[in-house]
Structure formats: C-alpha cells, structure tokens
C-alpha cells in the first residue's frame, strides 16, 4: 500500500514517527540563478548591478522590464516559454543559447519549428550557437560556441534558464538518521 501526503511538509522527526519501511521523497528543485548549466560547471562571473531572474521568479510574477536577455542552456521548452511570455509582457527579448536550435530538445517531439516560429512572430531576437560568459552591469558578454569570439549584448535584466538545484535537505537529514529507521 502507498500513502501520499501531497502538499504537506514534514520534517525528519515527523517522517520517522510514521515508522515507514520505505520512504519516497519528492521535494522538487529550484532553478539556479548563478548560470551553472551545460556550458558552465561553476557560476558565471556576474556584476551585482545586473538584475538576474530565473523561471521560478517569472512564474511567481516577478517580471523584468525593458531589454531582457534570456540565457537558455537547458535546451528543453522553458527558455522558449520564458521568451514568449516576456515578449507578450512588452519586454524587448533576446534569447541566447549555445545550441544550434531554440529549445533544441523539442526537435525530438517535433515542436521545435513551431516554437521558433512563435518566437520570431513575437519579436524575440534569437541568437544561436552563443553562450554567456559574464553578466556585466549593463549587458551580457557572449561567446561563439565554435570560436569563443566574444561580444557584448546590452540589456537591463537577464533570465537564466540553466540547471536546477534539488531541494534535498530533507533527504540528507533522513540519511543522517538512518540508524533510526
């Protein structure tokens, strides 16, 4: 038998009180704002003056204004969704990705062409085969995926669609008390 406790946060002590033999934890993850992703295994150098957002911020209603660069190094659907939404909200959007296609993975689901088309029709500037190497006070430095040639794209804010960080504190707390299972 399986019992689900959806939307109820339990701490380690409460979970252990149940006396379960097996525990499955699904605590989710949050989008990283530091640029760690496929291109970067360490945070991107960033000037603190540049406002940085994640998909979590956008979905919570915290929206940038003005010229926005979306750095999509996730390659699934989220970068395209963020770009379209912000363009609809009146932002001047540039989507930068080191991939050769917008939302590259969606080529596997035959959606990539439609996503690219929608973004172009929404007025989004699409910059392919370029990564982001630094967040400056007034723009982002990008590099060519093939030559590493660099240039600066001026912007007022950046949305990073990169890696996610697991919410795994509960897991580690449980593992530290494994003898009590």
Where are these regions (language model features)?
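Glycine-rich phosphate/pyrophosphate-binding loop
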Residues: 36-37
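Short boundary/hinge segments that flank catalytic cores
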Residues: 41-43
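Iron-sulfur cluster-binding electron-transfer modules in prokaryotic oxidoreductases
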Residues: 57-59, 77-78
């Amino acid at each position: 038998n399986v019992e689900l406790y959806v939307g109820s946060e339990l701490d380690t002590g409460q979970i252990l009180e149940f006396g379960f033999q097996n525990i499955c934890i699904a605590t989710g993850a949050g989008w990283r704002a530091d640029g760690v992703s496929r291109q970067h295994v360490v945070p991107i150098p960033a000037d603190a003056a540049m406002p940085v957002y994640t998909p979590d911020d956008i979905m919570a209603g915290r929206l940038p204004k003005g010229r926005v660069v979306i750095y999509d190094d996730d390659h699934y659907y989220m970068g395209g969704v963020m770009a379209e939404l912000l363009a609809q909200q009146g932002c001047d959007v540039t989507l930068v990705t080191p991939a050769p296609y917008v939302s590259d993975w969606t080529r596997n689901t035959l959606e990539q062409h439609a996503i690219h088309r929608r973004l172009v029709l929404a007025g989004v500037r699409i910059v392919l085969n370029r990564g982001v190497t630094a967040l400056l006070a007034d723009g982002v430095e990008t590099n060519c995926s093939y030559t590493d040639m660099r240039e600066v794209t001026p912007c007022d804010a950046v949305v990073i669609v990169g890696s996610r960080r697991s919410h795994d504190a509960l897991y580690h707390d449980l593992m530290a008390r494994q003898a009590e299972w």
